[in-house]
């Protein structure tokens, strides 16, 4: 399927809810209004959408929110989606707070991957930016995902003055775990949310800082299935790392021309 800009669209990003159990300062203003329940797509309608998208060439589906596990019946929806499409690449983006009880179900249905958002390894700062004291639960669920063998990527919004001092901790996590740790440039998300130039930490500056910690080698980007992240392997004094570093640069280096996603 090609759009009006002749981009090859084969990836569906489907938001199952706009509701979330966290109140991240860069995402939520605290004054938001939610879509009325009767106006939100029913799961049956989403299943029909996926069917139609696959008929048009979509090969990969990512389910997002809000927080998808905050919507009742989401795990059951994933089970039905997998049963209907055994070969479909199905992924989920989550904040990691509510996924725990569903991990064995996700393993059983063969969920392809999880993107998990975590901006800090500090409990106090986690509560500061999310408004919730759930850091321990997220770390517990990260370990459970690793134990279950479900591939996941760790996404962190990079912010000067907030988590730039934690770069060594993020790099160390990537060195010792077989996952991609990806930094996303801080960008404006809407009226009333926290954003300023002083907090912006560009992808090139992050990469320079990482090079002061470990050796990095760029990974050749996939032409068809590659996402917006530029990936790097890592090596330290004790040898190569188990994971990789990713940089996503919506502000300093736009990737819209290569976008392969339909967002609903």
Model-derived regions: residue spans:
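Canonical Radical SAM [4Fe-4S] cluster-binding loop centered on the CxxxCxxC motif
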Residues: 4-43, 55
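Active-site phosphate/pyrophosphate- and oxyanion-stabilizing loops and adjacent acidic/basic residues
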Residues: 14, 79, 168, 204, ...
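Glycine-centered loop/turn positions within well-structured domains
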Residues: 22, 123-124, 254
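A short acidic, helix-capping loop that chelates divalent metal ions and anchors anionic groups
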Residues: 32-36, 122-129, 190-194
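Short, conserved loop/turn and helix-capping segments at secondary-structure boundaries
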Residues: 40-43, 132, 197-200, 204
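Radical SAM/AdoMet-radical enzyme domain recognition
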Residues: 43-63, 70-184
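Short, conserved beta-strand edge motifs with alternating hydrophobic and charged residues
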Residues: 155, 182-185, 233, 246-248
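Accessory C-terminal segments flanking Radical SAM cores
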Residues: 190-264
């Amino acid at each position: 399927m090609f759009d009006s800009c002749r981009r090859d669209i084969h990836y569906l990003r489907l938001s199952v809810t706009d509701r979330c159990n966290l109140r991240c300062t860069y995402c939520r203003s605290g004054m938001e209004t939610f879509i009325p329940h009767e106006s939100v797509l029913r799961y049956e309608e989403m299943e029909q959408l996926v069917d139609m998208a696959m008929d048009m060439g979509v090969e990969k589906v990512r389910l997002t929110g809000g927080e998808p596990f905050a919507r009742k019946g989401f795990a059951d929806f994933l089970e039905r989606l997998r049963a209907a499409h055994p070969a479909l690449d199905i992924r989920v983006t989550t904040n990691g707070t509510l996924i725990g009880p569903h991990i064995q179900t996700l393993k059983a249905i063969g969920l392809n991957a999880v993107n998990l958002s975590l901006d800090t390894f500090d409990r106090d700062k986690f509560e500061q930016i999310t408004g919730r004291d759930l850091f321990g639960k997220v770390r517990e669920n990260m370990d459970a995902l690793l134990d279950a063998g479900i591939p996941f990527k760790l996404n962190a919004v990079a912010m000067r003055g907030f988590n730039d001092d934690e770069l060594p901790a993020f790099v160390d996590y990537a060195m010792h775990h077989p996952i991609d740790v990806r930094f996303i440039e801080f960008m404006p998300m809407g009226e009333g949310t926290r954003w300023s130039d002083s907090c912006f930490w560009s992808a090139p500056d992050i990469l320079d800082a990482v090079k002061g910690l470990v050796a990095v080698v760029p990974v050749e980007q996939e032409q068809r299935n590659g996402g917006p992240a530029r990936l790097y392997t890592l090596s330290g004094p004790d040898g190569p790392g188990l994971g990789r570093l990713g940089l996503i640069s919506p502000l300093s280096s736009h990737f819209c021309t290569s976008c392969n996603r339909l967002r609903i």
